[in-house]
Amino acid sequence: MKSGEFFTVEQLKKHRVIAITDIILQEVSTPEVDDVIRISDDSGRGSGKIEHEHMKPALCILAAGIGSRLENFSEHINKGLLPLNNQAIISHLIDKTPEDYDVIMVLGYKSEMVKEYCKIAHPDRNFIFVTVDNYEGKETGPGYSISQAKKHLQRPFIWVTADTVVTDDFPPADYNWLGLYPTSIPELYSTVNVKGGSVIDFKNKSKDGYDYAFIGLAGVYDYETFWKQLVGDEIVSAYYDVDKY
């Protein structure tokens, strides 16, 4: 920055005042500033620009599958277009993110129908459509689907399956988080062990699982770690080693 220039730190972005002397040192989140000297950073980050703080986050909706568990309900329509309160499910998901987020739609089954709907229902949003070459049978699933959009997700992002329904707005993609819901049947779901608000273990469809089920919604801040951990068609494989995050 040059002499006389300034920037505004948005509310809640300032963490604390470090010291007040002739010079005021403040800890702030400043993606507007390229040249930063970090003194005693809590996360051990070095000085200088942090690339992903300058990237526009994205919302990735996984809508490639045929929706077989819905049986006749998805016979003629993509499951993400099924109505909920007079609006398609994917519209509820899109509306829960800031308008400047890119929306990456990973498509397969009834893909053209979904494209047409998105363009008409959300003309002000920037969509990137990714078509999955294989969305039925073996070696398919959300892990495989999201891998097809990898080049568009080299930045913090939120991913969600097209049939996920939540009532609250999504948290921002400026930290790693998972969407959870209580369950008494862990053998049917991927479940997590939560301690002090943090995930300390993850099990996939085990009778020895935990009390909170993963609902197919997550915020990915450490996207490089996510891609390194992801294996095969099971997207939850990216979270088996939670200590990596």
Model-inferred region functions:
Residues M1-R16:
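Short acidic-glycine-tyrosine-enriched beta hairpin
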Residues R155-V165:
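Short beta-strand-to-loop acidic/aromatic patch adjacent to the donor-nucleotide binding site
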Residues V166-S237:
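Conserved core of the sugar-phosphate nucleotidyltransferase
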Residues S237-K244:
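An accessory alpha-helical subdomain
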Residues M55-I61, R69, P83, Q87-P156:
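Conserved N-terminal catalytic core of the sugar/cofactor nucleotidyltransferase
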Residues S29, A63, L107, T161, ...:
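Short beta-strand/turn micro-motifs composed of small residues
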Residues K13, I66, D163-T164:
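Active-site metal-binding loops of divalent metal-dependent hydrolases
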Residues R16-M55:
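Double-stranded beta-helix
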